[in-house]
Amino acid sequence: MGVQFNDSIPKKNISITDLKNKTVAIDSMNIIYQFLSSIRLRDGAPLRNSKGEITSPYNGIFYKTIYLLNNEITPIWVFDGKPPELKLKTREERRKVKEKASKDYEIAKREENIEDMQKYAKRINYLEPNTVDNCKKLLKLMGIPYIDAPSEGEAQCAHMIKNGDAYCVVSQDYDALLYGAPRTVRNITASNKPLELMEIEDILKPLDISIDDLIDMAILIGTDYNIGGIKGIGPKKALTIIKNKKMNEYIKDIENYEEIKNIFKNPKVVDYTKEDIKLKSPNIEGLKEFLIEENDFSPNRILPSIKKLDKLLNEKRSQTSLDSWF
């Protein structure tokens, strides 16, 4: 969900070539939900294997990773750990939205209204118990690094950017900026939208605010830890409050204000080694078994893609070895 800054945050359109020779830290859960929304059948239903298990995330991860490698971009996928207690309310709100969408979908299905079926199906997104583990299994088989964050994935991504191990966070949300990420790129999963780059300095300097001010703006508007924020306050009004130094007048109306701010300013992150984020050789037979035998992907599509993945990773590792000599 994330904070809804919308058009109040300056962005600039970039090309995929602008990320060439760079490493990106991917907010995995955010992007996986994007795959669940976008990779669907004509009636809005997600892709499933013969056992009835949803496979849209595996499709998205496999082909998007190859797309990034083909554009000379190194991905590191970062998965959420245990969420802060304050986020439980957000999950309950999402559950209610999905329940209503499920009922609306069934009505549209009975009426054979394909357009409404597609609309409501995209709101039902949910992860099956083994989906995340299988996504990690797929990445390991592909030879692609991933990190398990202790808590929020965006915070871990931001930590990796600040460490110099990645150039930007890849996410549809703005939250990574609140954790101090210097750069976030949006729309990497969208085929019909330009990539959007948000740089923290290009946000703070023109607005003449600090990162603390940006966090306060987010809390006024509403975050995953205080859904809805303060009634009647959107991005423009929040900025006015901050610029006029009026934040203290609103703190008393914000439950758990200090705890929320501390989540953003002092997030839980995990240390990692260079080996943890290194590209490795793909397990070709393992990929065939997982994608084709276990999840019913078409061999005609998968086999050439596995071959391409192997070629791209070999080229990448060869280049890395060559660079280490100079």
From Swiss-Prot:
EC number: 3.1.-.-
GO biological process terms held by the UniProt record: DNA repair; DNA replication, removal of RNA primer
Residues the entry annotates as binding Mg(2+) 2: 173, 175, 224
Subunit and partners: Interacts with PCNA. PCNA stimulates the nuclease activity without altering cleavage specificity.
Name listed for the protein in its UniProt record: Flap endonuclease 1
Co-factor(s): Mg(2+)
NCBIfam families on file: fen_arch
Function: Structure-specific nuclease with 5'-flap endonuclease and 5'-3' exonuclease activities involved in DNA replication and repair. During DNA replication, cleaves the 5'-overhanging flap structure that is generated by displacement synthesis when DNA polymerase encounters the 5'-end of a downstream Okazaki fragment. Binds the unpaired 3'-DNA end and kinks the DNA to facilitate 5' cleavage specificity. Cleaves one nucleotide into the double-stranded DNA from the junction in flap DNA, leaving a nick for ligation. Also involved in the base excision repair (BER) pathway.
Keyword RNA-binding among UniProt keywords: no
Sequence positions that bind Mg(2+) 1: 27, 80, 152, 154
Annotated region described as Interaction with PCNA, given as residue ranges: 318-326
GO function terms (MF aspect): 5'-3' exonuclease activity; 5'-flap endonuclease activity; DNA binding; magnesium ion binding
Region of interest: I-domain: 116-245
Cofactor detail note: Binds 2 magnesium ions per subunit. They probably participate in the reaction catalyzed by the enzyme. May bind an additional third magnesium ion after substrate binding.
Region described as N-domain: spans on this chain: 1-98
Family affiliation: Belongs to the XPG/RAD2 endonuclease family. FEN1 subfamily.
